[in-house]
């Protein structure tokens, strides 16, 4: 039944996307071809026929907010895939509540706004009255207190650190303040008011951050979280505070499941936390993300398991020694392999996160990563192999020549500059090698039942942790080869397609060529450019003749 539910929800999302074409919607992304490139495109994507959330917002959310007498509304934009709907929500909320103060915050909007200045920064605010950059607990509290006292103008609010506001002379700006807060002074997260009983989950799993930032902080590809470059400064809560918070949240919300949702946590600290949890008698179950350190020996892994650890996702990145050195990962494949085996032998699901195509990575080096995964397969609970993407605040973007890049660029016409493109000095892989790599990855993945987020079989997710806790850390290897689910309420049937699939495949290939021309050759994006390039292609009849 679970597989059937996954298939049915996936089909529903595809239907929603088709009804709002050219939108592509899933649980991690919300994409339309020209999204966020100009204020006009932002407004276009907010139109009712293009926004699947329009009915909910106008018929449910706005009346609910109106009944509450709201005078301040905040939108947290954590992930890039949330940017488009956030701007759409902002336009409609401002239209419905012109007197309310509308504020944005979160990692995704922070990393956009920090790169912009003056008029460009003002344009990026869109319909928002303000935006919080960096970690926002103190800034948001100061804003709410100021609004409560009747201070509503940008001039009156300009004294609040890290609050981006319109400015009549410069366009927009903010008073710089400390980017990171004192984690030890913060209370436990507050989930009151959220409809936790309506989440698609058989049980409740809550996120909790025992630390913030990264204690290593040197990986060249990384620009993550609420920071201008790299990663934020590492901070920890006291172990006794973490245990107290987790215990209180467990009782209040009736759950024993948590995800320790920090960027990284020092192994020594995690060991002390596991010991304290074991001694507390709380009997919690948790997962987290870790660096694959040499300290993850058999004794520490056994302590983690006794303290309730169910799964640990390891940021492995690559199994090529040269690529790891270039990244400045600080570990070797041998260290990673031992950490994986020690976790697995302790009964903890060891999940592996890798990626290919780091600048200058060769085909042989990418294949070394896949061979490593194959060798460690008996100990790996699940894995993902992504593809490198260049991010603005990473060391690769700041020092491109050191990493073999000829150049990097933002295409003209992209007002927010959300996409960063690059070219290597020398192409590291041929086209046919990329095909071979994808084929090898498909063969490797067939040894597990792997799914996309947020389903069981994806990494660092609630459903996956529940599966590990119930069926053991090898459950997704055991389920490999399981048939795909069926649409609920339907009968399987075969039908001849009305569409010419060969022509559809050719159309997809042509679409990719158009976007390569736009992003890598002309380096300018607009509907006019797209239309001119599309007009140069021969027209095709996609419906089969009767």
Q: Where do the protein language model's features map onto the residues?
A:
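A structural motif corresponding to the C-terminal lobe/cap of the Radical SAM core domain
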Residues: 70, 128, 236, 280-285, ...
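Radical SAM enzyme core and accessory elements
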Residues: 1-23, 38, 68, 423-546
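Conserved Radical SAM active-site core
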Residues: 1-70, 88, 95-98, 114, ...
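Glycine-rich beta-alpha loop elements in corrinoid/cobalamin-binding modules
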Residues: 32-176
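Conserved beta-strand positions
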Residues: 75, 104, 133, 224, ...
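Acidic/polar loop patches that form or flank catalytic/metal-binding clefts of enzymes
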Residues: 152-158, 172-175, 234, 256-258, ...
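Radical SAM [4Fe-4S] cluster-binding motif and immediate context
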Residues: 184-349, 371
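Short glycine-centered, acidic/aromatic-flanked micro-motifs in structured strand/loop junctions
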Residues: 75-79, 260-263, 290, 356
């Amino acid at each position: 039944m679970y597989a059937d539910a996954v298939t049915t929800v996936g089909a529903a999302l595809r239907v929603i996307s088709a009804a709002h074409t050219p939108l592509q919607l899933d649980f991690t992304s919300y994409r339309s071809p020209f999204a966020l490139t100009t204020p006009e495109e932002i407004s276009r994507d907010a139109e009712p026929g293009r926004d699947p959330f329009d009915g909910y917002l106008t018929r449910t959310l706005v009346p609910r907010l109106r009944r509450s007498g709201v005078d301040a509304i905040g939108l947290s934009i954590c992930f890039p895939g949330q940017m488009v709907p956030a701007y759409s929500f902002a336009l409609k909320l401002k239209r419905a509540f012109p007197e309310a103060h509308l504020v944005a915050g979160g990692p995704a909007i922070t990393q956009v706004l920090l790169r912009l200045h003056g008029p460009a920064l003002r344009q990026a605010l869109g319909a928002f009255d303000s935006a919080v950059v960096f970690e926002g607990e103190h800034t948001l509290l100061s804003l709410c207190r100021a609004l409560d006292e009747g201070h509503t103008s940008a001039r009156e609010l300009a004294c609040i650190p890290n609050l981006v506001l319109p400015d009549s002379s410069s366009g927009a700006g903010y008073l710089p303040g400390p980017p990171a807060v004192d984690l030890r002074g913060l209370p436990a997260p507050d989930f009151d008011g959220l409809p936790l009983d309506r989440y698609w989950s058989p049980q409740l799993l809550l996120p909790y951050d025992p630390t913030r930032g990264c204690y290593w902080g040197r990986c060249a590809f990384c620009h993550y979280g609420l920071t201008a470059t790299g990663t934020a400064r590492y901070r920890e809560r006291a172990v006794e505070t973490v245990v107290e918070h987790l215990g209180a949240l467990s009782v209040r919300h009736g759950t024993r499941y948590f995800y320790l949702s920090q960027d990284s946590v020092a192994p020594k600290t995690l060991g002390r936390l596991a010991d304290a949890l074991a001694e507390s008698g709380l009997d919690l179950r948790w997962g987290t993300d870790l660096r694959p350190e040499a300290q993850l020996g058999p004794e520490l892994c056994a302590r983690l398991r006794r303290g309730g650890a169910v799964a640990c996702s390891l940021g492995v990145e690559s199994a090529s020694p040269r690529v790891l050195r270039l990244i400045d990962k600080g570990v070797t494949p041998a260290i990673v392999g031992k950490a994986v085996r020690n976790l697995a032998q302790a009964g903890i699901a060891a999940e592996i996160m890798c990626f290919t195509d780091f600048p200058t990575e060769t085909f042989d080096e990418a294949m070394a990563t896949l061979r490593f995964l194959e060798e460690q397969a008996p100990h790996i609970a699940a894995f993902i192999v992504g593809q490198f993407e260049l991010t603005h605040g990473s060391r690769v973007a700041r020092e491109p020549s050191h990493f073999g890049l000829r150049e990097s660029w933002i295409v003209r016409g992209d007002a927010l500059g959300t996409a960063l493109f690059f070219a290597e000095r020398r192409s590291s892989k041929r086209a046919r090698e990329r095909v071979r790599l994808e084929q090898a990855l498909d063969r490797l993945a067939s040894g597990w039942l792997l799914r996309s987020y947020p389903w069981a079989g994806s990494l660092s997710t609630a459903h996956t942790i529940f599966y590990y806790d119930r069926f053991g850390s090898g459950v997704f290897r055991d389920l490999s080869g399981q048939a795909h689910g069926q649409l609920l309420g339907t009968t399987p049937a075969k039908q001849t397609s009305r569409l010419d699939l060969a022509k559809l495949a050719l159309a997809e290939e042509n679409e990719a060529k158009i976007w390569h021309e736009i992003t890598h050759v002309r380096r300018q994006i607009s509907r006019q450019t797209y239309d001119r390039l599309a007009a140069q292609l021969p027209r095709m009849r996609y419906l089969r003749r009767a």
